[in-house]
């Protein structure tokens, strides 16, 4: 129930294209629990209508006249925060801007498509994200306030030479959550770090890697097929591919697989978890941060059963508690920590794996 006395999800549509505003209205029209609160044709109008209409969710374009989407996101999130979903193109520039919007406080994005064949897919993704994000509003707003927290790099004491690996899984809310975790990992971490962030095929993961690399001591890169795995490097799975690891003749390499989605996503956490078990066995430290659905639940259970160490983000600091909750329910989690304590826990668990304590 919202402040207007109904249980519908009041949505504000922001796009400078009248055609696109109408298209989004049409996509949402068949959802009985979603109500269009209004629309806006630029960022300034979005800021004004956000204040006057008090929507539950805002769908925001990036490139608009008068005030662009990035400025509007920053203004709204600094004054009267509302969950914002960016509606962005899959171009290099569009990917960069969408990622910047996520860093400024937007919760998620849905990629635009010029093909009419993708309309049903976009509609489903948009509706699913509106519903899931709306159901998590309190956690989202808490996390927005916590983004001001910038901790120091966590130092560890190591006596091994990279006999273990770290896995981090995330989805909705992942880019901002990853920014709370990866830059605080030490540059001398004697293990590779594999990151599966649910992203569509395109340029988003590359832009994410470049952003995190700028902020971190570790080297962060988008993973490439057949690349040799090196300790101290963070490999982010590219969108549209499952990332796996395979060891042959004493050398571990990344294998990118173009196949069917698992849990409706590609890359999937469960896929790399399975392959990591084959290579690293019990010598895995795994953290699941945020996201819808249950990807990672089965994989984390197998990692824990094999003797690996697993962490889930706490509900009160998680954007979307679906994936962590599913992993906890499956019995796949050793410890639950607030997002800002996860770097310390990764380092602590890594010390145990590395030093055999």
From Swiss-Prot:
Give me the Gene Ontology terms describing cellular component.
cytoplasm
Q: Where is the active site?
A: 171, 198, 295
MF terms in GO? phosphorelay response regulator activity; protein-glutamate methylesterase activity; protein-glutamine glutaminase activity
Tell me the GO BP annotations in alphabetical order.
Answer: chemotaxis
Q: Where in the cell is it found?
A: Cytoplasm
Q: What Enzyme Commission number(s) appear in the record? A: 3.1.1.61, 3.5.1.44
Where in the numbering of this chain does the CheB-type methylesterase domain appear?
Answer: 159-353
Q: Please report any disulfide bonds recorded for this protein chain, giving both cysteine positions.
A: none
The UniProt record lists the keyword Phosphoprotein: yes
Q: Which Gene3D superfamilies match?
A: 3.40.50.2300, Methylesterase CheB, C-terminal domain
Could you tell me the keywords of this UniProt record?
Chemotaxis, Cytoplasm, Hydrolase, Phosphoprotein
Taxonomically, which superkingdom?
Answer: Archaea
Presence of keyword Hydrolase: yes
Q: What is its main location?
A: cytoplasm
Can you summarize the PTM annotation of this record? Phosphorylated by CheA. Phosphorylation of the N-terminal regulatory domain activates the methylesterase activity.
Specify the Response regulatory domain's residue ranges.
10-127
4-aspartylphosphate-modified residues are 61
Reproduce the free-text note on domains from the UniProt record.
Contains a C-terminal catalytic domain, and an N-terminal region which modulates catalytic activity.
Main function: Involved in chemotaxis. Part of a chemotaxis signal transduction system that modulates chemotaxis in response to various stimuli. Catalyzes the demethylation of specific methylglutamate residues introduced into the chemoreceptors (methyl-accepting chemotaxis proteins or MCP) by CheR. Also mediates the irreversible deamidation of specific glutamine residues to glutamic acid.
Q: Which family does it belong to?
A: Belongs to the CheB family.
Q: Which HAMAP family match?
A: CheB_chemtxs (MF_00099)
Q: What is this protein called?
A: Protein-glutamate methylesterase/protein-glutamine glutaminase 1
Taxonomy, top ranks, is: Archaea, Methanobacteriati, Methanobacteriota, Stenosarchaea group, Methanomicrobia
| Gene name tied to this protein | cheB1
């Amino acid at each position: 129930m919202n402040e207007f006395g109904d249980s519908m999800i009041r949505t504000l549509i922001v796009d400078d294209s009248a055609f696109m505003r109408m298209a989004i209205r049409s996509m949402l029209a068949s959802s009985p629990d979603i109500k269009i609160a209004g629309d806006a044709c630029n960022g300034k109008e979005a800021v004004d209508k956000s204040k006057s209409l008090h929507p539950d969710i805002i769908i925001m374009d990036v490139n608009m006249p008068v005030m662009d989407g990035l400025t509007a996101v920053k203004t709204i999130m600094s004054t009267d925060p509302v969950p914002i979903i960016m509606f962005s193109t899959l171009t290099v520039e569009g990917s960069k801007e969408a990622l910047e919007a996520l860093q400024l406080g937007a919760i998620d994005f849905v990629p635009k498509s010029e093909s009419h064949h993708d309309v049903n897919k976009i509609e489903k993704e948009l509706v699913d994200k509106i519903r899931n994000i709306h159901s998590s509003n309190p956690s989202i707003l808490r996390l927005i306030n916590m983004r001001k927290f910038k901790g120091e790099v966590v130092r560890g004491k190591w006596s091994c030479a990279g006999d273990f690996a770290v896995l981090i899984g995330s989805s909705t809310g992942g880019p901002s959550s990853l920014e709370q975790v990866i830059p605080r990992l030490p540059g001398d971490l004697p293990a590779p770090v594999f990151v599966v962030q649910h992203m569509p095929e395109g340029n988003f993961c590359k832009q994410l890697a470049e952003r995190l690399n700028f902020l971190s001591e570790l080297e962060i890169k988008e993973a490439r097929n057949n690349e040799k795995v090196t300790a101290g490097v963070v490999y982010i799975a590219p969108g549209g591919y499952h990332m796996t690891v395979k060891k042959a003749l004493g050398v571990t390499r990344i294998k990118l697989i173009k196949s069917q989605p698992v849990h409706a996503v590609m890359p999937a956490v469960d896929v790399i978890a399975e392959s990591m078990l084959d290579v690293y066995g019990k010598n895995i430290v795994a953290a699941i941060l945020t996201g819808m659905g249950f990807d990672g639940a089965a994989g984390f259970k197998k990692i824990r059963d094999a003797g690996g160490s697993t962490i889930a983000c706490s509900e009160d600091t998680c954007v979307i508690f679906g994936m962590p909750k599913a992993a906890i329910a499956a019995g796949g989690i050793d410890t639950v920590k607030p997002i800002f304590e996860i770097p310390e826990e990764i380092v602590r668990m890594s010390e145990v794996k590395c030093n055999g304590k």
